[in-house]
């Protein structure tokens, strides 16, 4: 059966010049191609974006990324999950794809082990852009990159963007999106991060990050300090509190995150405000019998007020003996 010679694609998309890999023989028009691809992608989204998503270290690997692309387009294109061999207007030289993709996987894996001053949304934006920049496959790289960025955010229990269908069509939305990617080409990720946030991408709040046992392994030591710095830099309040009134500062004292405590105070967290516990940060430090942190609060102007009840005995032990 005669195959279509060429489809028309929106600005910034990689045109498909060779349709010989098209599997559904009845597809001759772009709207038919869009439909069968959308059905295939929806099935992949159900598989990879629903349910629990593991730490990126367990799945952000070259082999798995190729499997995901194959799952997205394997019912439509024979080249799904196979590295691009052609020179395209977007993307690196095909000979560099294996090395560049492997390096990206190593970098993403390192984010789970070493401190990097990026929020989770900022990390996802870099993942998205780098995959688009590498352009590993013959086509579908934008949609693939967005799904991977979404999966990355879900791994950290963050809300991913609700990407509009207009991204696949000529128009203002797509033009704005392409502009953010071009800014990222110049190492300016702010427009892409803002674009993703506008579409619903969110980081955990500071209080949620510190309180939730899920994030405990992510905020220990220097790694946690870097993430908190990134959240504060991106506009999170040092006086943030949970929906039921537990403040990030008090939660940090309770959890023993001394460096995060100091960082929050450096960013002007209030040292005398009581939270849901009914205690000030100084009083919680006393209850923890942590004189180092208690003295730190005093050095920052906190009121030296003993905790009520049995807390007075601990205060007496620390400051009266």
Residue ranges with predicted function:
Residues 1-215, 226-230, 277:
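FIC/Doc superfamily catalytic core
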Residues 218-220, 253, 286:
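Specific position within ankyrin or ankyrin-like helical repeats
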Residues 227, 259-260, 292-293:
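Conserved ankyrin/ankyrin-like repeat signature
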Residues 229-237, 262-270, 296-303:
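Ankyrin repeat domain, specifically the short helix-to-loop turn at the C-terminus of the second helix
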Residues 242, 275, 308-309:
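Ankyrin repeat boundary/linker residues
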């Amino acid at each position: 059966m005669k195959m279509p010679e060429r489809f028309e694609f929106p600005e910034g998309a990689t045109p498909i010049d060779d349709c010989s890999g098209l599997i559904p023989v009845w597809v001759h028009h772009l709207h038919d191609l869009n439909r069968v691809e959308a059905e295939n992608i929806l099935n992949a989204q159900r598989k990879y974006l629903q349910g629990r998503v593991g730490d990126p270290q367990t799945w952000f690997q070259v082999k798995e990324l190729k499997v995901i692309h194959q799952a997205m387009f394997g019912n439509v294109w024979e080249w799904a999950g196979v590295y691009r061999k052609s020179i395209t207007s977007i993307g690196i030289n095909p000979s560099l794809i294996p090395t560049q993709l492997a390096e990206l996987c190593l970098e993403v894996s390192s984010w789970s082990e070493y401190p990097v001053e990026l929020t989770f949304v900022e990390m996802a934006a870099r993942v998205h852009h780098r995959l688009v920049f590498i352009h590993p496959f013959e086509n579908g790289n934008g949609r693939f990159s967005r799904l991977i960025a979404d999966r990355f955010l879900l791994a950290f229990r963050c809300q991913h963007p609700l990407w509009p269908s207009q991204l696949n069509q000529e128009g203002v939305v797509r033009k704005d999106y392409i502009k953010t990617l071009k800014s990222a080409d110049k190492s300016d990720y702010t427009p892409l991060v803002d674009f993703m946030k506008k579409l619903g991408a969110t980081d955990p709040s500071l209080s949620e990050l510190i309180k939730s046992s899920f994030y405990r392994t992510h905020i220990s030591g220097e790694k946690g300090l870097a993430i908190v710095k990134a959240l504060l830099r991106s506009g999170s309040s040092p006086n943030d509190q949970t929906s039921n009134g537990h403040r990030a500062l008090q939660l940090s004292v309770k959890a023993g995150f001394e460096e995060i405590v100091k960082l929050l105070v450096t960013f002007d967290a209030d040292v005398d405000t009581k939270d849901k516990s009914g205690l000030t940060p100084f009083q919680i430090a006393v209850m923890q019998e942590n004189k180092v942190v208690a003295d730190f609060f005093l050095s920052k102007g906190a009121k030296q007020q003993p905790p009520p009840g049995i807390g007075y005995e601990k205060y007496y032990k620390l400051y009266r003996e």
